[in-house]
Design a protein with these regions (language model features):
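Non-catalytic alpha/beta scaffold blocks inside enzyme catalytic domains
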Residues: 1-51, 75-77, 81-230
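Short connector loops at secondary-structure junctions
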Residues: 51-77
Length: 230
C-alpha cells in the first residue's frame, strides 16, 4: 500500500544512521544484480537527507574474507571468470549457482563450504555428474558426496590466520590447540594442488601463468596476516 511505503520512507529519512542489508532475496531473484543497483541508488538518495550505508548480509564464517581477497586480486568481489585468461565479472552468469544449474562444469572443487545443504537441487544434480573434490573441516552434506575429500583443521582453533568481519575489518585468529597429525591446512592443500597442476602443464608445454599474484598495498594489519580460505 502507498501509505505503508510512505511510512517506510519517512522512517528511513528521519533516522540518524541507517543500514540497508541485502541477501539472496535480491541477488538470486528476478533482476539479479540490477536489484542491487536500485538498492545502492536508494542508499545514495537517502544520504542527501541522513547517513545511510548498504551492506550484504552474509551468513557463514569469513564469507567477507573471500570477497576481500577476490577484490584485491581481480578487482571483483565474486562471480569471477578466468576462462579467457583474465578476470571477467558477470553476476547472474558466472556465479557458482548459475554455472552449476546450466551444467557448464566438468569438475567441481569445494573449499570450506557446504553447497550440498544450500544450493538448488538442479545445481547439485549437475555437480554430481562430474568429479567432486571437497576441502572442508567438517563432514558436512557436500563432503559426504565428494569423490575426493580433504579434511582440514579449523582456522582460529587449530591454526592461526585472519578472518574478516561482515564490515570488512580483518580479525587476527590465534591457534589454540594442535591439529591432528598429518592434517594439512586448506592453504597447504591448495598450494600442493597448484604445484601439481603447473608441473603437468609444463610437461605438456603449456603456459603456466603467473608464479605468484601480488596484491596491492594494504594497511599493515592486513599485509601481516594470511586470510583463512573460505
Amino acid at each position: 500500500p502507498v501509505d505503508y511505503l510512505k511510512d517506510v520512507a519517512d522512517a528511513m529519512m528521519s533516522c540518524e544512521f541507517g543500514v540497508i542489508y541485502f541477501g539472496l532475496g535480491l541477488t538470486q531473484s528476478l533482476g539479479r544484480f540490477r536489484n542491487i543497483e536500485v538498492a545502492i541508488a536508494l542508499a545514495r538518495d537517502l544520504n542527501r537527507k541522513t547517513k545511510f550505508i548498504i551492506s550484504p548480509l552474509r551468513g557463514h564464517f569469513n564469507v567477507t574474507g573471500a570477497n576481500v581477497v577476490f577484490a584485491w586480486q581481480t578487482g571483483y568481489p565474486y562471480a569471477v571468470d578466468f576462462s579467457q585468461g583474465y578476470p571477467q565479472f558477470n553476476p547472474g552468469e558466472n556465479t557458482a549457482t548459475d554455472l552449476l544449474r546450466r551444467g557448464d562444469n566438468d569438475a567441481t572443487l569445494i573449499i570450506s563450504s557446504d553447497p550440498g545443504a544450500h544450493f538448488p537441487a538442479s545445481a547439485i544434480r549437475n555437480m554430481m555428474k562430474h568429479p567432486l573434490i571437497t576441502i572442508n573441516p567438517d563432514m558436512n552434506a557436500i563432503s559426504r558426496l565428494g569423490d575426493v575429500v580433504f579434511p582440514t583443521p579449523r582456522c582460529g582453533i587449530e591454526y592461526a590466520g585472519t578472518a574478516y568481519r561482515m564490515d570488512s575489518v580483518p580479525i587476527t585468529l590465534k591457534k589454540v590447540v594442535e591439529a591432528p597429525p598429518g592434517i594439512l591446512t586448506d592453504e597447504e592443500i591448495l598450494t600442493r594442488i597448484l604445484a601439481e597442476v603447473r608441473a603437468i602443464k609444463v610437461k605438456r608445454g603449456e603456459p603456466v601463468g603467473q608464479t605468484e599474484v601480488q596484491p596491492p598495498a594494504q594497511k599493515e594489519s592486513v599485509k601481516e596476516s594470511k586470510p583463512c580460505k573460505t
